[in-house]
Amino acid sequence: MIRLNIMGIYLLLCDDADEARRLQASCEPVVGVLTDENRDVDFSGISYLVENPEEIDDEDYYRIWQRLKKLPWDILETERCKVRETTVEDVDSFYEIYKAPGITDYTEPLFENPEDEVQYAIDYRENVYSLYGYGIWTVLDKATGKVIGRAGLTMREGFKEPELGYVIAREYQGQGIAAEVCKAILEYGQKELGFTLIQAFTKRENLPSEKLLKKLGFTFDREELLGTEKFDCYILDMR
């Protein structure tokens, strides 16, 4: 077993499956290491397995450590905002944002029971962030650290292209923040996630959203029926 000390944290690299499971059960940040000698060994239950650990850089190891410790990844920063993965501590702020008049006119509401929203955030971390590496993230005011919205990229069931979504607190609207954050997210999607086509859905009467999408380079593609409601689908082609 190797103790890897990087960026102020440590990870344990272990090529013994039973020992790795014991360490993980003790809440130690352990990563299983596959070798030619143990390739047929059962490593089931180990959250992370790697080959050629010397080829993995410190930043990737740090992100593995964050996953094991259930800590959020920092995604990106803009001039005024920070975007990171959502935590359960953000939920109260979401309810404050969503209770403002007009916020849920074009945005799916939160659960009626905050406990359900907390559980959703936990499940989202485990089943979306950990699996895909992207999703809807939390937007913070970089100057104050205050949660001011949500934005990100998701994969809607039945569609091939990722979808841009966002909601910004009412008191922060009209300042260009949505455009600033969404532009950075689109660049992240292209450079870090390899996306070349991104879609967005908006109601025809939602003129501010339509204006923003066009400003970001989206063009109208088609009308789409989502559930029982009609939406305009816009596409951004970054090929």
Give the positions of each predicted feature.
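GNAT-family acyltransferases
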Residues: I6-I9, Y48-E171, Y188, E192, ...
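Acidic, Mg2+-coordinating phosphoryl-transfer loop and its flanking beta/alpha structural elements
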Residues: L12-G45
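Aromatic/hydrophobic pocket-lining residues that form the small-molecule binding cavity
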Residues: D16, V118, C182
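Conserved active-site alpha-helix within GNAT-family acetyltransferase domains
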Residues: K146, E205-R222
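Conserved acetyl-CoA-binding loop-helix of GNAT-fold acetyltransferases
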Residues: Y166-I168, G174-K191, L207-K215
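Conserved beta-strand-loop-alpha-helix junction that forms the acyl-donor binding cleft
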Residues: A200-E210, G227-E229
